[in-house]
């Protein structure tokens, strides 16, 4: 079987060694989107992360690929129709709850973004690089004892809430999948509006689906009162135009995100990306680096390799 690793930067050498002994392996790190799509005609197994998208790939070609390995939790950059039509088995981390309890970097990044936002860290660093030393203009806020709202109480929501609790934050959580009998460690909100009405820091951790697409819009944001909003889930859960208006109207005191709308196809078309280029507002955008650590790459690549080999050996 022919295997292509299409994103080889910082790839587990142990996994490469195992693959090279069992398969005809090619390792690449500079394929264009077009060449990546053409690889489905040549390889049996293709391995990639988030660099490419499979949303507009031609379904009418003679596809050879039978296994697609993508060691990430969010797979909205991959067409389900394409996979089903060509009988390609997707191996990802989506739904791997037990394993993912050990993968913490996105929760850590959420806390970093929160602190950086509240303390004006990025703007103060940039100002020092310009040769200034203006302490007073970057006075910030403490995280300790703040009212924090968590939207989405799955793996990452729980993990992030537990870290916030170390700062003695007053936590309220909302999840549309809550049941009355669910036992949780923190106060439970019945409506998402209550999260925005009563909290000073709001962190989003929902999956992207038909229910959560544009979940946060003007209808919800109008309840904010000078809050800090952080999104490390998916860019599409926000209406970016409405977020920008909330920033300009000072309903939001600051906004930070590791994800933007439509980033898998053309990040430059994101309204938040364009706004951030010239805005002087308190905004932080990072290029989807939440799970992007050496440690997590090593762990996740070994895990999906085991899944792949188990399937092939059946």
PLM feature spans:
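Rossmann-like dinucleotide/phosphate-binding beta-alpha-beta segment
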Residues: 1, 136-226
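N-terminal glycine-/charge-rich "phosphate-binding" loop or analogous flexible N-terminal tail
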Residues: 1-45, 168-172
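Structural alpha-helical scaffold elements that stabilize or flank donor/cofactor-binding regions
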Residues: 38-39, 61, 194-195, 220, ...
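Short acidic/histidine-rich motifs immediately flanking catalytic phosphotransfer sites
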Residues: 40-45, 62-66, 197-202, 225-227
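Phosphate/diphosphate ligand-binding glycine-rich loop within oxidoreductases
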Residues: 44-125
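Short glycine-/small-residue-rich Rossmann-like dinucleotide-binding loops
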Residues: 51, 73, 200, 205-208, ...
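Rossmann-fold NAD(P) dinucleotide-binding segment
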Residues: 52-65, 211-229
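Rossmann-like dinucleotide-binding domain for NAD(H)/NADP(H)
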Residues: 96, 170, 226-227, 233-314
């Amino acid at each position: 079987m022919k295997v292509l690793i299409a994103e080889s930067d910082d790839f587990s050498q142990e996994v490469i060694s195992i693959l090279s002994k069992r398969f005809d392996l090619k390792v690449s790190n500079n394929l264009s989107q077009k060449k990546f799509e053409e690889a489905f005609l040549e390889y049996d197994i293709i391995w990639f992360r988030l660099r490419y998208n499979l949303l507009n790939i031609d379904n009418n070609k003679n596809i050879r690929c039978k296994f697609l390995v993508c060691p990430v939790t969010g797979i909205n950059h991959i067409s389900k129709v394409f996979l089903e039509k060509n009988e390609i088995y997707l191996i990802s981390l989506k739904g791997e709850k037990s394993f993912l309890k050990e993968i913490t970097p996105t929760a850590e990044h959420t806390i970093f973004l929160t602190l950086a936002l509240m303390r004006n860290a990025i703007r103060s660093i940039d100002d020092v690089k310009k040769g200034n030393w203006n302490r007073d203009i970057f006075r910030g806020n403490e995280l300790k004892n703040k009212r924090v709202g968590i939207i989405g109480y799955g793996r990452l929501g729980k993990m992030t809430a537990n870290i916030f609790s170390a700062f003695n934050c007053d936590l309220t959580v909302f999840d549309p999948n809550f049941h009355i009998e669910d036992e949780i460690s923190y106060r439970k909100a019945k409506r998402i509006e209550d999260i925005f009405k009563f909290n000073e820091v709001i962190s989003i951790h929902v999956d992207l689906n038909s229910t959560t697409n544009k979940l946060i819009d003007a209808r919800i944001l109008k309840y904010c009162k000078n809050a800090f909003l952080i999104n490390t889930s998916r860019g599409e859960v926000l209406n970016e135009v409405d977020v920008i208006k909330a920033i300009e109207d000072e309903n939001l005191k600051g906004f930070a995100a590791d994800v933007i709308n439509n980033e898998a196809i053309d990040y430059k078309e994101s309204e938040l990306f364009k706004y951030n280029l010239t805005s002087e507002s308190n905004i932080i955008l990072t290029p989807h680096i939440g799970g992007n650590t050496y440690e997590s790459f090593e762990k996740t690549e070994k895990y999906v390799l085991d899944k792949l080999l188990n399937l092939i050996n059946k």
